[in-house]
């Protein structure tokens, strides 16, 4: 029984997901429906958490919009997510960067990973 579930989940998973880690700056393009129109909307920010669960994987992106912190959780293999592009690699030592929620301005900066 579990082999059938694994096979179905494997078929639904996206193959073109780039590798990214917490601390990386990514641009996620998401399909948005407004009335009858469907368009792409970009959300660019720092990845503060990744949850690896196969088909149910998700990641959290945080950005500052008009001086207000905005976080959004994306399902990695969702059909709503059109593309994920890594803009900048960040050098961090933790898997979850929730401490960035309390930091503002220069204190919230992340060093760039050079490799």
Curated annotation (Swiss-Prot):
Database matches in Pfam families: Ribosomal_L19 (PF01245)
Keyword terms, alphabetized: Ribonucleoprotein, Ribosomal protein
Gene3D superfamilies to which the protein is assigned, alphabetical: 2.30.30.790
Any one annotated GO CC term: cytosolic large ribosomal subunit
Entry-linked PROSITE patterns: RIBOSOMAL_L19
InterPro entries named among the record's database cross-references: Ribosomal_bL19, Ribosomal_bL19_CS, Ribosomal_bL19_sf, Translation_prot_SH3-like_sf
GO biological process terms held by the UniProt record: translation
GO molecular function: structural constituent of ribosome
Domain of life: Bacteria
Protein role: This protein is located at the 30S-50S ribosomal subunit interface and may play a role in the structure and function of the aminoacyl-tRNA binding site.
Family named by the database record: Belongs to the bacterial ribosomal protein bL19 family.
Protein's name according to its UniProt entry: Large ribosomal subunit protein bL19
